[in-house]
């Protein structure tokens, strides 16, 4: 831990005594800087450019060293806009990597990539900071206990349960509901979760960051009256930020979460929305750094960059980090290098389907595409495992029959297949659920469904006890009792119409 040399406070006065260089080239967010012989900064060192632009405005840009070019020159990536910078400007080497505030005083606050508060609530009351670049915990320190993390979302808890202290990915293309699902998980887990949470907004909409902040305040997760009692720290590097900020803001959020795990020995929730923007930001600066592009134009260091971030998100004997990450899937292609590289690091994958979203089934989670390492009889129990497998088998059979139904119609199916299709359609609708965070859009109050209730509901559908109920009774309800009540209401309504 050290005093942060890149933010305002007692560390800044020492900057003037540091190593000085001069800008020799500026290409967008990438700067080339020349230093005196024998005074080259290290890779990942933080550099600060101070001065005035042509109209006299104060400039204060922080950069990170990426390459040593030879001839006493380095190449660095800026963490903020490079507008107004000129060749010949003085650059100060801080002599240390970018460091951000950590600890209890970060809770209830919003930070940028540099660890500077951006919520107009004054400076952060801490002198404890931590560098954003660290090595992952040693293998011997890791924790290997298996336990389920209940989310209250039926499709997730039944078919792809989340591991406490694991890494979870929400995969989906544009506009299928990743952010709504991650906000619902924050709502269901962070409120009920006794520990602390860190939320990293990486290259997403500023509006969504603002909505999340307002919702946290309304729910009491952020306590406005006594900020020290808050349960979450927010770190934002939104899509209007330069690629340097989007490339490093995930590490800033992770560094804050690691402190709670390692020093405070707490169980931490880490939400990252969206991990693909971290990859895209790296791709943006990769060519400017002179690297040859790899597959589909991505940076050749894609696997290394992803691995260095993901391997730090883990559970140790001191505490755990349970991370939930949204993963944007370009053009709905799961074989794209960005989602494909992310897959390898995850314990559970929740895949969102555009086909289900088009049908109006939300959350649009694909029951056959979503997977979890936790769905084993010895971990979840025989009853849960058996129910999940039967739901998947029924859904798979329905998928196989859809072409026949489209060409010949339902009447050409065997009696057994017709029954399978009817139950599969009920299952498909029962996997939908009204969300708390979507109440303003749907007008339906949100529902939290416990795991035992979820298993009971699907067992009743599979057993045939509810074959007589109309399939629309299962759409957007909580537990199975609500579905039977809705069926009775539909029956009463139809009688009144007659």
Curated annotation (Swiss-Prot):
Cellular component terms per the entry's GO annotation: chloroplast thylakoid membrane; mitochondrion; proton-transporting ATP synthase complex
Main subcellular location: plastid
Positions contributing to ATP binding: 172-179
Topology of the protein relative to the lipid bilayer: Peripheral membrane protein
Primary enzyme class: translocase
Listed InterPro entries: AAA+_ATPase, ATP-synt_VA_C, ATP_synth_F1_bsu, ATPase_a/bsu_AS, ATPase_alpha/beta_chains, ATPase_F1/V1/A1_a/bsu_N, ATPase_F1/V1/A1_a/bsu_N_sf, ATPase_F1/V1/A1_a/bsu_nucl-bd
Catalytic reaction list: ATP + H2O + 4 H(+)(in) = ADP + phosphate + 5 H(+)(out)
UniProt keywords, alphabetically: ATP synthesis, ATP-binding, CF(1), Chloroplast, Hydrogen ion transport, Ion transport, Membrane, Nucleotide-binding, Plastid, Thylakoid, Translocase, Transport
Cellular location(s): Plastid, Chloroplast thylakoid membrane
Enzyme Commission number, as recorded: 7.1.2.2
GO biological process assignments: proton motive force-driven mitochondrial ATP synthesis
GO MF, one annotated term: proton-transporting ATP synthase activity, rotational mechanism
Pfam families: ATP-synt_ab (PF00006), ATP-synt_ab_N (PF02874), ATP-synt_VA_C (PF22919)
Purpose of the protein: Produces ATP from ADP in the presence of a proton gradient across the membrane. The catalytic sites are hosted primarily by the beta subunits.
Family: Belongs to the ATPase alpha/beta chains family.
Subunit structure: F-type ATPases have 2 components, CF(1) - the catalytic core - and CF(0) - the membrane proton channel. CF(1) has five subunits: alpha(3), beta(3), gamma(1), delta(1), epsilon(1). CF(0) has four main subunits: a(1), b(1), b'(1) and c(9-12).
Record protein name field: ATP synthase subunit beta, chloroplastic
